[in-house]
């Protein structure tokens, strides 16, 4: 929680509890701000129960996991209270995190949208050799008949071909970064989207 994060502590501990506030939406601002000074690998980020015990807010299970995956991911809930479907979803979420863990621990971070300043949060992690990347975004509040949200990735190799998942399309890095990707957020508040990029 508060005041546990200071630069000197990293001499003794590689990972710190980022905040006692584990609300999926609140964590976008908490993690965004913390990342200005500390590596994502040092930020302990947990998926917790809903309604959240600090804010009373309900956020989708998938969204809580997507935001937690932008740090050292864990779970803070009682597995005995989970349904069979939720347990299966956790297994899928853990597999997703394992696939991107190398980017969390050693990739380059690009902050695309600041949730404190706009109704949008987006961060992108890119491998040092630009061979792969992941982009995660959250739209906190749903907007009726709102404009399309276009995300502009950064840090890709302009001349390389990338497969974009889950769309299963192949585009040049330059095209992806300049034309952008339309973000199809799930209906409702606090929806997230995640895109993976792999050199084709």
Language-model segment annotations:
Residues 173-200:
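C-terminal beta-strand-rich structural cap/linker in extracellular carbohydrate-active enzymes
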Residues 1-9, 83-87, 110-118:
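A glycine-rich phosphate-binding loop feature that marks nucleotide/adenosyl-phosphate handling sites
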